[in-house]
Amino acid sequence: MFGLNKTPSFGSTGTQNQNTGTSAGTGLFSSNTFGNNTQANTPASTGFGGVTGGAFGQTKPQTGGSLFGNKPNATSTTPGLNLFGQNPQAAPGGSLFGASTTKPQAPGGLFNQNQTQAQPAQAAPTGGLFGLSGQNQTQSQTQPAQANTSLFGQSNIGTTGGLFDQNRPNTSTFGQFSTQPASAGLFGQSTQPSGSTGFGLSNNTQTTPFFSAAQQQPSTTQLPSNPAINATTRYSSLNANTQKFLDDLDKEIFSQIQLAEELQTKLGTVSELVESVPNDVAEVQRRLSSVSTALLIDSDEIETTKRVVDEDTSNARISSRILDVFKTPGATYPFASNDPLMNYFEQFTENAKKRTDLYAATIGELEQHLEQVETTPQNNSPEALLKTIKEEHKLFMALSNRFAQVHDEVKRLQVNTSTSLPFIS
Protein backbone atom coordinates (compact mmCIF):
# COMPACT_ATOMS: atom_id res chain seq x y z
CA MET A 1 0.00 0.00 0.00
CA PHE A 2 2.87 2.35 0.75
CA GLY A 3 4.87 1.60 -2.38
CA LEU A 4 4.99 -2.18 -2.29
CA ASN A 5 4.08 -4.11 -5.39
CA LYS A 6 0.81 -5.89 -5.19
CA THR A 7 -2.03 -6.98 -7.32
CA PRO A 8 -4.42 -4.13 -8.18
CA SER A 9 -7.74 -4.18 -6.49
CA PHE A 10 -9.95 -2.58 -9.13
CA GLY A 11 -8.60 -3.93 -12.37
CA SER A 12 -5.56 -1.72 -12.61
CA THR A 13 -2.57 -3.25 -14.36
CA GLY A 14 0.54 -3.58 -12.39
CA THR A 15 3.41 -4.08 -14.81
CA GLN A 16 7.07 -3.59 -14.44
CA ASN A 17 9.59 -2.38 -16.87
CA GLN A 18 11.60 -5.33 -18.05
CA ASN A 19 14.42 -3.15 -19.23
CA THR A 20 15.22 -1.50 -15.98
CA GLY A 21 14.75 -4.50 -13.82
CA THR A 22 13.24 -2.44 -11.06
CA SER A 23 9.62 -1.72 -10.39
CA ALA A 24 8.45 1.63 -9.08
CA GLY A 25 5.35 1.14 -7.01
CA THR A 26 3.13 4.08 -6.37
CA GLY A 27 2.13 4.85 -2.83
CA LEU A 28 -1.11 6.05 -1.46
CA PHE A 29 -0.63 9.54 -2.90
CA SER A 30 1.00 8.34 -6.15
CA SER A 31 4.40 9.65 -5.11
CA ASN A 32 7.03 9.06 -2.56
CA THR A 33 7.13 10.77 0.75
CA PHE A 34 8.16 14.22 -0.50
CA GLY A 35 6.69 14.08 -3.99
CA ASN A 36 9.91 12.98 -5.79
CA ASN A 37 9.14 10.77 -8.69
CA THR A 38 10.59 7.31 -8.92
CA GLN A 39 12.52 6.11 -11.91
CA ALA A 40 10.06 3.40 -12.81
CA ASN A 41 8.69 3.56 -16.31
CA THR A 42 5.75 1.25 -15.81
CA PRO A 43 3.70 2.30 -12.80
CA ALA A 44 1.75 0.02 -10.59
CA SER A 45 -1.66 1.31 -9.70
CA THR A 46 -3.03 1.67 -6.22
CA GLY A 47 -6.28 0.55 -4.80
CA PHE A 48 -8.11 3.75 -5.86
CA GLY A 49 -7.52 3.71 -9.59
CA GLY A 50 -4.29 3.41 -11.49
CA VAL A 51 -3.57 4.32 -14.99
CA THR A 52 -6.56 2.44 -16.30
CA GLY A 53 -8.98 4.79 -14.45
CA GLY A 54 -10.24 4.99 -10.91
CA ALA A 55 -13.69 4.65 -9.58
CA PHE A 56 -14.52 8.25 -10.47
CA GLY A 57 -12.47 8.50 -13.61
CA GLN A 58 -9.45 10.22 -12.16
CA THR A 59 -6.18 9.65 -13.84
CA LYS A 60 -3.20 8.80 -11.72
CA PRO A 61 -0.13 9.97 -13.52
CA GLN A 62 3.05 8.21 -12.71
CA THR A 63 4.90 11.33 -11.88
CA GLY A 64 3.99 13.29 -8.76
CA GLY A 65 4.50 16.92 -7.95
CA SER A 66 7.70 17.94 -6.25
CA LEU A 67 7.87 19.85 -3.02
CA PHE A 68 8.01 23.25 -4.71
CA GLY A 69 5.75 22.46 -7.66
CA ASN A 70 8.50 21.81 -10.24
CA LYS A 71 7.51 19.83 -13.23
CA PRO A 72 8.92 16.32 -12.94
CA ASN A 73 10.09 14.17 -15.79
CA ALA A 74 6.99 12.10 -16.23
CA THR A 75 6.44 9.30 -18.66
CA SER A 76 3.37 9.03 -20.75
CA THR A 77 0.30 7.79 -19.04
CA THR A 78 -2.79 6.24 -20.41
CA PRO A 79 -5.93 7.98 -19.17
CA GLY A 80 -8.86 5.84 -18.24
CA LEU A 81 -12.53 6.44 -18.39
CA ASN A 82 -14.49 7.67 -15.39
CA LEU A 83 -17.65 6.25 -13.92
CA PHE A 84 -19.91 7.76 -16.59
CA GLY A 85 -17.60 7.24 -19.51
CA GLN A 86 -16.11 10.70 -19.73
CA ASN A 87 -12.57 11.23 -20.77
CA PRO A 88 -11.03 13.29 -17.95
CA GLN A 89 -8.06 15.55 -18.27
CA ALA A 90 -5.04 15.88 -16.12
CA ALA A 91 -5.65 18.01 -13.05
CA PRO A 92 -3.17 20.72 -12.11
CA GLY A 93 -1.27 20.17 -8.94
CA GLY A 94 -0.41 22.89 -6.54
CA SER A 95 3.01 23.31 -5.06
CA LEU A 96 3.78 24.10 -1.48
CA PHE A 97 3.51 27.87 -2.04
CA GLY A 98 0.59 27.79 -4.48
CA ALA A 99 2.42 27.81 -7.83
CA SER A 100 0.20 26.23 -10.44
CA THR A 101 1.36 23.41 -12.68
CA THR A 102 1.03 23.44 -16.41
CA LYS A 103 -1.89 21.05 -16.92
CA PRO A 104 -5.20 22.24 -15.48
CA GLN A 105 -8.19 19.97 -15.40
CA ALA A 106 -11.84 20.84 -15.10
CA PRO A 107 -13.47 18.01 -13.14
CA GLY A 108 -16.87 16.79 -14.11
CA GLY A 109 -19.98 16.69 -11.98
CA LEU A 110 -21.77 13.74 -10.62
CA PHE A 111 -24.27 13.63 -13.48
CA ASN A 112 -21.66 13.94 -16.24
CA GLN A 113 -21.98 17.54 -17.31
CA ASN A 114 -20.11 18.25 -20.51
CA GLN A 115 -16.56 19.37 -19.95
CA THR A 116 -15.37 21.19 -23.05
CA GLN A 117 -11.95 22.48 -23.80
CA ALA A 118 -11.05 25.45 -25.87
CA GLN A 119 -7.77 26.49 -27.44
CA PRO A 120 -6.28 28.67 -26.15
CA ALA A 121 -7.33 29.65 -22.64
CA GLN A 122 -5.83 30.47 -19.32
CA ALA A 123 -5.47 28.00 -16.52
CA ALA A 124 -7.41 28.54 -13.32
CA PRO A 125 -5.28 29.45 -10.33
CA THR A 126 -5.25 27.20 -7.34
CA GLY A 127 -4.69 28.15 -3.74
CA GLY A 128 -1.30 27.61 -2.16
CA LEU A 129 -0.45 26.51 1.31
CA PHE A 130 -0.93 30.02 2.75
CA GLY A 131 -3.88 30.93 0.55
CA LEU A 132 -1.77 32.87 -1.94
CA SER A 133 -2.97 32.93 -5.49
CA GLY A 134 -0.94 30.58 -7.59
CA GLN A 135 0.97 32.12 -10.47
CA ASN A 136 -0.31 31.10 -13.86
CA GLN A 137 2.28 29.60 -16.10
CA THR A 138 1.66 29.92 -19.79
CA GLN A 139 1.86 26.90 -22.02
CA SER A 140 1.30 26.17 -25.62
CA GLN A 141 -1.89 24.24 -25.14
CA THR A 142 -4.20 25.32 -22.32
CA GLN A 143 -7.83 24.80 -21.51
CA PRO A 144 -10.22 26.98 -19.52
CA ALA A 145 -10.74 26.18 -15.92
CA GLN A 146 -14.22 24.87 -15.50
CA ALA A 147 -16.20 26.02 -12.54
CA ASN A 148 -16.81 23.28 -10.05
CA THR A 149 -20.41 22.34 -9.64
CA SER A 150 -22.21 21.30 -6.52
CA LEU A 151 -24.08 18.12 -5.82
CA PHE A 152 -27.16 19.22 -7.78
CA GLY A 153 -25.39 21.04 -10.56
CA GLN A 154 -25.50 24.52 -9.03
CA SER A 155 -22.69 26.86 -9.86
CA ASN A 156 -20.06 26.84 -7.15
CA ILE A 157 -17.98 29.93 -7.57
CA GLY A 158 -16.50 30.04 -4.13
CA THR A 159 -12.81 29.80 -3.49
CA THR A 160 -11.17 28.84 -0.26
CA GLY A 161 -8.88 31.03 1.73
CA GLY A 162 -5.40 30.44 3.01
CA LEU A 163 -4.01 30.02 6.44
CA PHE A 164 -4.17 33.74 7.24
CA ASP A 165 -7.79 34.17 6.12
CA GLN A 166 -7.60 35.82 2.76
CA ASN A 167 -10.97 36.42 1.15
CA ARG A 168 -12.89 33.24 0.43
CA PRO A 169 -16.62 33.26 -0.28
CA ASN A 170 -18.31 29.90 0.30
CA THR A 171 -21.61 28.45 -0.74
CA SER A 172 -24.11 26.26 1.00
CA THR A 173 -24.58 22.53 0.68
CA PHE A 174 -27.13 22.88 -2.13
CA GLY A 175 -25.14 25.44 -4.05
CA GLN A 176 -27.09 28.47 -2.88
CA PHE A 177 -25.11 31.62 -2.50
CA SER A 178 -25.00 32.82 1.08
CA THR A 179 -23.28 35.72 2.73
CA GLN A 180 -21.56 35.99 6.03
CA PRO A 181 -20.07 39.04 7.73
CA ALA A 182 -16.39 39.51 7.91
CA SER A 183 -14.60 37.32 10.45
CA ALA A 184 -11.20 37.87 11.89
CA GLY A 185 -8.28 35.70 10.82
CA LEU A 186 -5.53 34.16 12.83
CA PHE A 187 -3.69 37.46 13.19
CA GLY A 188 -6.78 39.69 13.01
CA GLN A 189 -6.96 40.26 9.26
CA SER A 190 -10.42 41.12 8.04
CA THR A 191 -11.92 38.27 6.04
CA GLN A 192 -15.04 38.05 3.95
CA PRO A 193 -16.21 34.43 4.34
CA SER A 194 -19.81 33.70 3.59
CA GLY A 195 -21.24 30.75 5.42
CA SER A 196 -24.67 29.29 5.34
CA THR A 197 -26.78 26.68 7.03
CA GLY A 198 -27.45 23.24 5.67
CA PHE A 199 -30.27 24.48 3.42
CA GLY A 200 -28.63 27.62 2.08
CA LEU A 201 -30.06 30.03 4.65
CA SER A 202 -27.95 33.00 5.53
CA ASN A 203 -25.97 32.51 8.73
CA ASN A 204 -24.57 35.89 9.67
CA THR A 205 -21.94 35.41 12.31
CA GLN A 206 -18.94 37.38 13.36
CA THR A 207 -15.91 35.94 15.07
CA THR A 208 -13.04 37.39 17.02
CA PRO A 209 -9.39 37.20 15.89
CA PHE A 210 -7.16 34.63 17.58
CA PHE A 211 -4.63 37.19 18.79
CA SER A 212 -7.25 39.93 19.46
CA ALA A 213 -6.01 42.26 16.74
CA ALA A 214 -7.94 45.46 16.17
CA GLN A 215 -10.93 45.13 13.88
CA GLN A 216 -12.74 47.85 11.97
CA GLN A 217 -16.16 47.33 13.47
CA PRO A 218 -18.26 49.41 15.84
CA SER A 219 -18.10 48.40 19.45
CA THR A 220 -20.99 48.88 21.81
CA THR A 221 -20.35 49.30 25.51
CA GLN A 222 -23.15 48.17 27.75
CA LEU A 223 -23.40 50.32 30.84
CA PRO A 224 -24.13 48.57 34.08
CA SER A 225 -27.79 48.90 34.89
CA ASN A 226 -29.01 49.91 38.32
CA PRO A 227 -30.69 47.22 40.33
CA ALA A 228 -34.44 47.21 40.38
CA ILE A 229 -35.94 49.27 43.22
CA ASN A 230 -39.15 48.11 44.81
CA ALA A 231 -40.96 48.50 48.11
CA THR A 232 -38.73 46.00 49.89
CA THR A 233 -35.41 47.47 48.73
CA ARG A 234 -33.22 48.65 51.58
CA TYR A 235 -31.31 51.90 51.62
CA SER A 236 -28.00 50.13 52.28
CA SER A 237 -28.40 47.93 49.19
CA LEU A 238 -28.49 50.92 46.83
CA ASN A 239 -25.45 52.32 45.10
CA ALA A 240 -23.79 55.60 46.07
CA ASN A 241 -25.43 57.72 43.36
CA THR A 242 -28.93 56.54 44.26
CA GLN A 243 -28.28 57.12 47.96
CA LYS A 244 -27.04 60.65 47.25
CA PHE A 245 -30.12 61.36 45.12
CA LEU A 246 -32.44 60.16 47.88
CA ASP A 247 -30.58 62.27 50.48
CA ASP A 248 -30.90 65.41 48.34
CA LEU A 249 -34.59 64.69 47.75
CA ASP A 250 -35.18 64.27 51.49
CA LYS A 251 -33.44 67.59 52.23
CA GLU A 252 -35.52 69.40 49.62
CA ILE A 253 -38.76 67.96 51.01
CA PHE A 254 -37.77 68.97 54.57
CA SER A 255 -36.95 72.54 53.47
CA GLN A 256 -40.30 72.86 51.70
CA ILE A 257 -42.10 71.62 54.83
CA GLN A 258 -40.32 74.24 56.95
CA LEU A 259 -41.25 76.96 54.48
CA ALA A 260 -44.90 75.86 54.53
CA GLU A 261 -44.97 75.93 58.35
CA GLU A 262 -43.44 79.41 58.40
CA LEU A 263 -46.03 80.70 55.94
CA GLN A 264 -48.80 79.08 57.97
CA THR A 265 -47.55 80.89 61.09
CA LYS A 266 -47.48 84.26 59.32
CA LEU A 267 -50.87 83.73 57.69
CA GLY A 268 -52.83 85.41 60.54
CA THR A 269 -50.63 88.50 60.59
CA VAL A 270 -50.72 88.79 56.83
CA SER A 271 -54.52 88.52 56.85
CA GLU A 272 -54.80 91.36 59.36
CA LEU A 273 -52.47 93.51 57.31
CA VAL A 274 -54.47 92.86 54.17
CA GLU A 275 -57.75 93.69 55.90
CA SER A 276 -56.32 96.94 57.30
CA VAL A 277 -55.32 98.21 53.87
CA PRO A 278 -58.78 99.70 53.01
CA ASN A 279 -58.88 101.55 56.35
CA ASP A 280 -55.41 102.90 55.78
CA VAL A 281 -56.40 104.06 52.31
CA ALA A 282 -59.46 105.89 53.70
CA GLU A 283 -57.32 107.57 56.37
CA VAL A 284 -54.80 108.67 53.79
CA GLN A 285 -57.56 110.09 51.61
CA ARG A 286 -59.00 112.02 54.58
CA ARG A 287 -55.63 113.46 55.45
CA LEU A 288 -55.05 114.34 51.84
CA SER A 289 -58.32 116.30 51.80
CA SER A 290 -57.34 118.16 54.96
CA VAL A 291 -53.95 119.02 53.57
CA SER A 292 -55.52 120.20 50.33
CA THR A 293 -57.91 122.48 52.25
CA ALA A 294 -55.08 123.85 54.37
CA LEU A 295 -53.05 124.55 51.26
CA LEU A 296 -55.93 126.45 49.73
CA ILE A 297 -56.37 128.54 52.90
CA ASP A 298 -52.67 129.27 53.03
CA SER A 299 -52.71 130.28 49.41
CA ASP A 300 -55.55 132.73 50.10
CA GLU A 301 -53.70 134.14 53.07
CA ILE A 302 -50.60 134.66 51.01
CA GLU A 303 -52.56 136.44 48.32
CA THR A 304 -54.21 138.66 50.93
CA THR A 305 -50.90 139.52 52.52
CA LYS A 306 -49.46 140.31 49.15
CA ARG A 307 -52.31 142.70 48.35
CA VAL A 308 -51.95 144.43 51.69
CA VAL A 309 -48.24 144.88 51.11
CA ASP A 310 -48.86 146.26 47.66
CA GLU A 311 -51.45 148.65 49.02
CA ASP A 312 -49.19 149.85 51.80
CA THR A 313 -46.37 150.37 49.30
CA SER A 314 -48.63 152.50 47.12
CA ASN A 315 -49.79 154.54 50.08
CA ALA A 316 -46.24 155.10 51.26
CA ARG A 317 -45.20 156.33 47.82
CA ILE A 318 -48.12 158.77 47.72
CA SER A 319 -47.31 160.05 51.21
CA SER A 320 -43.68 160.68 50.33
CA ARG A 321 -44.64 162.72 47.28
CA ILE A 322 -47.05 164.83 49.25
CA LEU A 323 -44.29 165.54 51.76
CA ASP A 324 -42.00 166.60 49.00
CA VAL A 325 -44.59 169.12 47.80
CA PHE A 326 -44.93 170.70 51.22
CA LYS A 327 -41.18 170.96 51.68
CA THR A 328 -40.86 173.21 48.69
CA PRO A 329 -40.98 176.94 49.77
CA GLY A 330 -43.99 178.80 48.45
CA ALA A 331 -45.65 175.67 47.07
CA THR A 332 -49.32 175.06 47.72
CA TYR A 333 -51.08 171.70 47.66
CA PRO A 334 -54.00 171.61 45.23
CA PHE A 335 -57.33 170.66 46.68
CA ALA A 336 -59.28 168.65 44.16
CA SER A 337 -61.59 165.71 44.22
CA ASN A 338 -59.08 163.53 42.43
CA ASP A 339 -56.34 164.21 44.93
CA PRO A 340 -54.56 160.94 45.83
CA LEU A 341 -54.37 161.91 49.49
CA MET A 342 -58.09 162.50 49.61
CA ASN A 343 -58.71 159.19 47.89
CA TYR A 344 -56.56 157.45 50.44
CA PHE A 345 -58.55 158.77 53.38
CA GLU A 346 -61.83 158.15 51.66
CA GLN A 347 -60.94 154.52 51.01
CA PHE A 348 -59.73 154.07 54.56
CA THR A 349 -63.00 155.47 55.91
CA GLU A 350 -65.08 153.27 53.67
CA ASN A 351 -63.12 150.15 54.67
CA ALA A 352 -63.56 150.95 58.34
CA LYS A 353 -67.26 151.43 57.85
CA LYS A 354 -67.58 148.12 56.05
CA ARG A 355 -65.75 146.34 58.77
CA THR A 356 -67.94 147.96 61.40
CA ASP A 357 -71.07 146.88 59.56
CA LEU A 358 -69.72 143.34 59.20
CA TYR A 359 -68.90 143.11 62.84
CA ALA A 360 -72.35 144.46 63.80
CA ALA A 361 -74.06 141.91 61.55
CA THR A 362 -72.00 139.11 63.00
CA ILE A 363 -72.75 140.17 66.54
CA GLY A 364 -76.45 140.34 65.71
CA GLU A 365 -76.40 136.81 64.34
CA LEU A 366 -74.63 135.61 67.45
CA GLU A 367 -77.24 137.24 69.65
CA GLN A 368 -80.03 135.62 67.74
CA HIS A 369 -78.37 132.25 67.94
CA LEU A 370 -77.64 132.63 71.62
CA GLU A 371 -81.24 133.56 72.29
CA GLN A 372 -82.37 130.42 70.52
CA VAL A 373 -79.93 128.37 72.52
CA GLU A 374 -81.16 129.86 75.75
CA THR A 375 -84.79 129.13 74.95
CA THR A 376 -84.02 125.46 74.09
CA PRO A 377 -83.65 123.45 77.33
CA GLN A 378 -81.93 120.41 75.78
CA ASN A 379 -79.23 122.54 74.18
CA ASN A 380 -78.13 124.39 77.28
CA SER A 381 -74.98 122.34 77.76
CA PRO A 382 -71.60 124.16 77.61
CA GLU A 383 -70.27 121.72 75.00
CA ALA A 384 -73.04 122.63 72.54
CA LEU A 385 -72.40 126.32 73.06
CA LEU A 386 -68.67 125.88 72.55
CA LYS A 387 -69.23 123.94 69.35
CA THR A 388 -71.55 126.62 68.03
CA ILE A 389 -69.03 129.36 68.71
CA LYS A 390 -66.30 127.42 66.89
CA GLU A 391 -68.48 126.95 63.83
CA GLU A 392 -69.31 130.65 63.77
CA HIS A 393 -65.63 131.48 64.06
CA LYS A 394 -64.85 129.37 61.00
CA LEU A 395 -67.65 131.09 59.12
CA PHE A 396 -66.38 134.53 60.05
CA MET A 397 -62.86 133.64 59.00
CA ALA A 398 -64.07 132.47 55.61
CA LEU A 399 -66.18 135.59 55.10
CA SER A 400 -63.39 137.91 56.20
CA ASN A 401 -60.99 136.14 53.88
CA ARG A 402 -63.34 136.61 51.00
CA PHE A 403 -63.96 140.23 51.94
CA ALA A 404 -60.21 140.87 52.05
CA GLN A 405 -59.83 139.47 48.55
CA VAL A 406 -62.52 141.77 47.21
CA HIS A 407 -60.98 144.71 49.03
CA ASP A 408 -57.56 143.99 47.56
CA GLU A 409 -58.96 143.84 44.06
CA VAL A 410 -60.62 147.21 44.54
CA LYS A 411 -57.43 148.75 45.92
CA ARG A 412 -55.44 147.44 43.01
CA LEU A 413 -57.81 149.08 40.60
CA GLN A 414 -57.57 152.33 42.52
CA VAL A 415 -53.79 152.27 42.58
CA ASN A 416 -53.63 151.67 38.85
CA THR A 417 -55.95 154.61 38.29
CA SER A 418 -54.00 156.95 40.58
CA THR A 419 -50.62 156.11 39.04
CA SER A 420 -51.92 157.21 35.68
CA LEU A 421 -52.16 160.87 36.91
CA PRO A 422 -49.44 163.32 35.68
CA PHE A 423 -48.23 164.54 39.05
CA ILE A 424 -48.01 161.02 40.49
CA SER A 425 -46.07 159.57 37.61
From Swiss-Prot:
Q: Which InterPro entries match?
A: Nucleoporin_FG_rpt, NUP58/p45/49
Q: Which GO terms describe its biological process?
A: mRNA transport; nucleocytoplasmic transport; protein transport
User: Would I find Transport among this entry's keywords?
Assistant: yes
Provide any one GO MF term from the record. nuclear localization sequence binding
Superkingdom in the source lineage: Eukaryota
Disulfide cysteine pairs (residue numbers): none
Mark out the compositionally biased spans (Low complexity).
11-27, 112-126, 135-150
Q: Which PANTHER family match?
A: NUCLEOPORIN P58/P45 NUCLEOPORIN-LIKE PROTEIN 1, NUCLEOPORIN P58_P45
Protein name in the entry: Nucleoporin nup45
| Organism of derivation | Schizosaccharomyces pombe (strain 972 / ATCC 24843) (Fission yeast)
Native organism taxonomy: Eukaryota, Fungi, Dikarya, Ascomycota, Taphrinomycotina
Originating gene: nup45
